[in-house]
Amino acid sequence: MAARKAKHAFRSQATQSDAERQDLDSKLAAVLESRGNANAVFDILEHLESKKEDVVQAAIRTTSKLFEVLLEKRELYIGDLPAEDDSPPDTCSAEDKYKMWMRNRYNSCVSCLLDLLQYSSFSVQELVLCTLMKFIQLEGKFPLENSEWRDSYRFPRELLKFVVDNLLQEEADCTLLITRFQEYLEYDDVRYYTMTVTTECVSRIQQKNKQVLPPVFQTNVFCLLSSINMPVEESTLGNFLVTKNENHEEWKPSKLKEQKRVFERVWMSFLKHQLSVSLYKKVLLILHESILPHMSKPSLMIDFLTAAYDVGGAISLLALNGLFILIHQHNLEYPDFYKKLYSLLEPSVFHVKYRARFFHLANLFLSSTHLPVYLVAAFAKRLARLALTAPPQVLLMIIPFICNLIRRHPACRVLIHRPSAGDLVTDPYIMEEQDPAKSQALESCLWELEVLQQHYHGDVVRAANVISRALSAQESDVSGLLEMSSCELFDKEMKKKFKSVPLEYEPVRGLLGLKSDITAEHFTF
């Protein structure tokens, strides 16, 4: 019985929704047919506040059709719109009064649509976003302002500002809707003005929250900025949402220099604030490919990168990429850079997610033959000491890495050919010293590599045995070893085919067992 009632209620609601949609269609036709039916616009807008999702969607589509026609027919007042509560001037004609009234209805519609960007259903949010962007396109084609721009090219910046402000919420996560908005960022004019209004939004929220950006707001801003695909050449600019026949060569969005300027400005306004650790990592991961190449002055990022480099841990590792670009491509200096890089060599560096990236960059930074011998020796010695507790897949990369350092700097060969090398107790190297210049590494030797010649893994033993022979001048290629995992190493071992199966750690010799057996020493069988 209850199921039958529920089914009946559902059918009743569906019938009612169909009736409301038909009512919307009839009112739309009536408004477009005669100005005498203009008051029906109120009924159409009222449906935007319906509690039924399908009715809300129907109302959104109806308002889109309605104001698209009215904008094309120039049925909305053009110019500075007086406040709705104020009486229109006596000089206003009936035509102007009607257009003012309809312009106010359009503004009310836009206001309702902006509120619906926070609707519970994503399908409604998406439909609203597309409708508002359609209005932006129409306002650009049929401007509602009288002001003459220098190049006769208008863009409804104010409406876009309202849209972006609603995407960059302080408390609501809008990343899904921002991802949908990414499609419009492919338009050069939308991209340019989005970056401009985002800068203003960040500044406004900063002042409102006493120089602090709320975490959710930070996430929304990053999602928006990371969705921007910047053009590389000016010749590719020309894909505009708002199209005009006039020449737009002098228009700022059509200039790559101006695009870079606002891109740089919006990122700098965002990154000057304290970010969460997770957001720091996300920014640093895309910095070298998606941000620095598109900035007018990449050197402005030095403060952000040095601050990130000083944080420690994975964030410092990720900051290396950006610093490498600034140091090698833009000739920027970083005091105590190698001292900081040296301090990052901790046991945890072998287990972090970004290990391969770190050692790739460390290899680049240590590739110069002009580095002081004591510095290279300190890096080689510290890596060798850390190798004593490293897993085998890391050792297969670390040992060739150390050997390459010695090959580049022949003066460091003393580390593997020191005849007066003492034991572990007399090793002069100071592991706890953070300054490589004071670590006394050059007075030590790489006895750690000799220890690794007794490692349980055969490949590690073969790699460590290199120091027992004359070291070749040709460097080893470690690029293929940087990302080796324990699973890959295990799979490699599983594929090996052995001629004999080892049954004992020490193979039995003779009938009486091991060679060291007391019986075998006196009897031979």
UniProtKB/Swiss-Prot annotation:
UniProt keywords, alphabetically:
Membrane, Nucleus, Transmembrane, Transmembrane helix
User: Transmembrane ranges?
Assistant: 307-327, 358-378, 386-406
Q: What InterPro entries does the entry give? A: ARM-type_fold (IPR016024), CCAAT-binding_factor (IPR005612), Noc4 (IPR027193)
An example GO BP is: ribosome biogenesis
Q: What Pfam families does the record point to? A: CBF
- How does the UniProt record describe the way this protein sits in the membrane? Multi-pass membrane protein
- Write out the ranges of the annotated region (Disordered): 1-21
- Could you name the Gene Ontology cellular component terms for this entry? Noc4p-Nop14p complex; nuclear membrane; nucleolus; small-subunit processome
Compositional bias per record (Basic residues), positions renumbered to this chain: 1-10
Where it sits in the cell: the answer is: Nucleus membrane; Nucleus, Nucleolus
- The UniProt entry lists the main location of this chain as nucleus
Family per record: Belongs to the CBF/MAK21 family.
* Name of the featured protein: Nucleolar complex protein 4 homolog B
